[in-house]
């Protein structure tokens, strides 16, 4: 999952709605930090698994479990979902993203994408954030 860029080579690195589609999202985040110049910005935004859109086209059935939701989708529609749980869609939590960002020492901000600013406090409440933050934005500034 190495990005094809040299270390410290870009001013801004953005990943929007990709992390939930790779098996190792924090490796992706690490690569983003590697290629971002010190003082630059890395922005990683992803759909939170337990949020209302975590199952993507499977809708809220992902609350039944990823494999079960995928099987139900295939039965109902006669073909597998485009985002196949376990191979092209993975359960990524808000807690894991916040923990990873904090561990880098580069975290600047974390907030829920698509929410008004007054609702940004939701990211600070464990459990609640997993269900009410549909998409988490992590902003990092490498040193």
Task: Name the predicted role of every residue range.
Residues 2-7:
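Short conserved loop adjoining the S-adenosyl-L-methionine
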Residues 14:
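A conserved beta-strand element that flanks and buttresses the S-adenosyl-L-methionine
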Residues 17-21:
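A short His-aromatic
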Residues 23-31, 37, 41-141:
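S-adenosyl-L-methionine-dependent methyltransferase catalytic module, highlighting the catalytic core
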């Amino acid at each position: 999952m190495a990005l094809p860029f040299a270390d410290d080579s870009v001013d801004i690195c953005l990943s929007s709605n990709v992390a939930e589609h790779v098996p190792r999202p924090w490796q992706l985040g690490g690569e983003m930090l590697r290629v971002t110049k010190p003082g630059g910005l890395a922005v990683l935004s992803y759909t939170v698994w337990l949020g209302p859109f975590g199952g993507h086209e499977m809708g809220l059935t992902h609350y039944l479990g990823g494999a079960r939701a995928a099987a139900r989708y295939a039965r109902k529609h006669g073909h597998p979902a485009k985002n196949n749980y376990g191979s092209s869609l993975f359960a990524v939590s808000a807690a894991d993203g916040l923990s990873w960002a904090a561990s880098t020492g580069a975290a600047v901000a974390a907030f829920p994408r698509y929410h008004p600013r007054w609702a940004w406090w939701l990211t600070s409440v464990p459990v609640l954030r997993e269900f009410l933050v549909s998409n988490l934005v992590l902003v990092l500034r490498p040193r």
